[in-house]
Amino acid sequence: MKNKKWISLAAAVILAVTALPMTAFAAEKDGGEEKLTKVTLNEVAHSIFYAPQYVAIEEGYFSEEGLDLTLITGFGADKVLTALISGEADIGFMGAEASIYAYQEGATDPVVNFAQLTQRAGNFLVAREEMPDFKWEDLKGRKVLGGRKGGMPEMVFEYILKKNGLDPEKDLSIDQSIDFGATAAAFTGDDSADFTVEFEPSATALEKQGAGYVVASLGVDSGYVPYTSYSARTSYMEKNPDIMQKFTNALQKGMDYVQSHTPEEIAEVIEPQFPETDLDTITAIVKRYYDQDTWKSNLIFEKESFELLEDILEDAGELKERTPYAELVNTEFAQNAS
């Protein structure tokens, strides 16, 4: 009887001792999961155009890299830039032209671009009537709801007009007074406008309502353009190189997913990001962007792309002087991630 008691006691001790490392390991693991580093990302708009970013969020790639990402939509590059400069955002996602403007104004802590997501414009020209044989010269004498002066949507639009022999100031009327994201509503409520320049899902929504028809893709007609990129203040990048690398790694995983999956698969992953849009519409939009080669295979912001951007700014009269590529672009994190 005593032997049985001793054996039971010994077994209990062995179990307790064996369990200690496992308990400690579990606590360490739990503790590790709780120690995700918080990062705030301010995006210029919430659009299917940025699908690789939402894939990275929905697939948990940021968490895998140890980051707790908070996503805020700024509704305009000017607002994203303000959030970056004020410190409300750690990382911004917008057109790189905003960083050039800030640099031109003598920013003491320059906003530097470190990853390029899109390589084409993501907006479309929507007409009030069906125009299967549309040509850019059809805009002569017509009214178009455009974008903010100095913003990428408007500058790329004007870049295309000039490529097709049109003078944006003389050959047509461009309304630049409407806030970003409000042009589709303005188009349905203002019969005086013949065309509007829209991102998705607004372009497809207008088509579904029978209120407009996509007649041209600015992304196709402008050619490859460094449309949107990720940026951060120089001081933040210098203090947090690990965070910058982890963030870029997560994005690259999203890029890899998009390159290796179908539009249908991509749409299913990002569907939770767009609760007001049905899956069929999301799929159609993803396919539209997919087919026109919207997303890069890597995040490296090449010098040639930066110089093309400056050409567009110069052509639009928005560039005081050309900025050295090395001053506003850092490719270290993107190269490491690719």
Which residues fall in each region the model found?
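Soluble non-cytosolic domains of exported or imported proteins
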Residues: 47, 74-78, 93, 151-152, ...
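Pocket-lining segment of extracytoplasmic ligand-binding domains
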Residues: 129, 181-274
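Predominant activation on well-ordered alpha-helical scaffold segments within soluble catalytic domains
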Residues: 54, 100, 158, 204, ...
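Secondary-structure end/capping motifs
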Residues: 238-320
